[in-house]
């Protein structure tokens, strides 16, 4: 049982997949940081100083403090029920950047990959030199004109 597991785990595809998952997780963290810390603050500034992480709708005020709340953290601390659409926008933008990066990566790999052409198949037929009909390669006599064919 252990030997079978070792063979399975050491197959190239399993190891490649594990490396891909680890690198993908790290890349996801980088993209999320890029979106939340680099892209969204200037975008929020351009559209009027809005912090996207603090965009939310209050469904029910909190029991500890009444609305309005200065930030999402204040609403959450007060026990308010909220729809956090700003965080959702950050996630959508992160996904779009991640999808575009994967697209560029796949496109680059496909450009580098050379199409391997299959070797030409060995001929299985030949042409009769007398009547020009097609006969099997191993034939010694033409089936159409009955001429003797050389080996």
Swiss-Prot record:
Quick one: where is this thing mainly located? Answer: membrane
User: What Gene3D superfamilies has UniProt attached to this entry?
Assistant: Large-conductance mechanosensitive channel, MscL, domain 1
Q: Which domain of life is it from?
A: Bacteria
What keywords were assigned to this record? Answer: Cell inner membrane, Cell membrane, Ion channel, Ion transport, Membrane, Transmembrane, Transmembrane helix, Transport
Which parts pass through the membrane?
14-34, 38-58, 86-106
Return the SUPFAM superfamilies for the record.
Gated mechanosensitive channel (SSF81330)
Question: Where in the cell?
Answer: Cell inner membrane
Q: How does it sit in the membrane?
A: Multi-pass membrane protein
Entry GO terms, CC: plasma membrane
Q: Which GO terms describe its molecular function?
A: mechanosensitive monoatomic ion channel activity
Pfam families reported in the protein's UniProt record: MscL
Protein's job: Channel that opens in response to stretch forces in the membrane lipid bilayer. May participate in the regulation of osmotic pressure changes within the cell.
* Family of this protein: Belongs to the MscL family.
Q: How does it assemble?
A: Homopentamer.
Name this polypeptide is given: Large-conductance mechanosensitive channel
Q: From which organism does this entry originate?
A: Pelodictyon phaeoclathratiforme (strain DSM 5477 / BU-1)
């Amino acid at each position: 049982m252990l030997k079978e597991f070792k063979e399975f785990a050491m197959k190239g595809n399993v190891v490649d997949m594990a490396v891909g998952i680890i690198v993908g997780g790290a890349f996801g963290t980088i993209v999320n940081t890029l979106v939340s810390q680099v892209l969204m603050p200037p975008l929020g500034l351009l559209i009027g100083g809005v912090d996207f992480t603090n965009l939310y709708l209050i469904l029910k005020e909190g029991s500890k403090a009444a609305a309005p709340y200065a930030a999402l953290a204040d609403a959450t601390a007060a026990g308010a029920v909220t729809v956090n659409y700003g965080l959702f926008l950050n996630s959508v933008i992160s996904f779009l950047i991640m999808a575009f990066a994967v697209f560029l990566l796949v496109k680059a790999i496909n450009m580098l990959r050379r199409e391997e052409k299959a070797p030409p198949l060995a001929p299985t037929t030949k042409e009769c030199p007398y009547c020009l009909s097609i006969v099997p390669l191993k034939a010694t006599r033409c089936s159409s004109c009955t001429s003797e064919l050389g080996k």
